[in-house]
């Protein structure tokens, strides 16, 4: 699907301090409520060194490729197709959203299946679930979701909330578009695949073709844990912020990513 094609001949990262020890972020500048808000707390921000980070193509799968695949019941009967994937604040897959598409005699309905109850075929062409016509009412969309989680509470989120989002570099530099998410076989979000904007060029003036892979930065990287430091992404954010400057990605080569 993709392979690590980063250049091996690179100089020291501009982020050497944060890569080695992390940046201890304190005293966030923001609303007055930050001092007493339980969500405003000290956060240690660590950026992963892109020149040593590797994404093993044998250990992950593409969210985009799983969306739209057939969903089968325990006896191999058609149930519908994969409509969306739900992640938790911990970056792990929590549920699969299934569109019945008229199967099971329900018309067009969406069902939620716990990821622990889902089996993905080795070739990722279909998934098997426990859903049957008799058990369908067990898979309501809102089962297990609290009625009110509060405005600052961390929450589950849909893959479609991040795929298609804009990507910024440090300094609010416009950079790219989120193309895909890569999940480990254990169900943990590993990486974000991005497509640079046609107007984004490297330091030598060349333009960035192809796709690039970056570590996933979600809850715990600034957003939702304080004010004044915008790193990573939380559901509802206007864009996905990478903790890298333009100089930090100049030497990176594209991933061999198959659409």
Where are the regions that the model predicts?
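Hydrophobic membrane-targeting alpha-helices
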Residues: 22, 26-31
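Peripheral interaction segments used for macromolecular assembly
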Residues: 2-18, 31-259
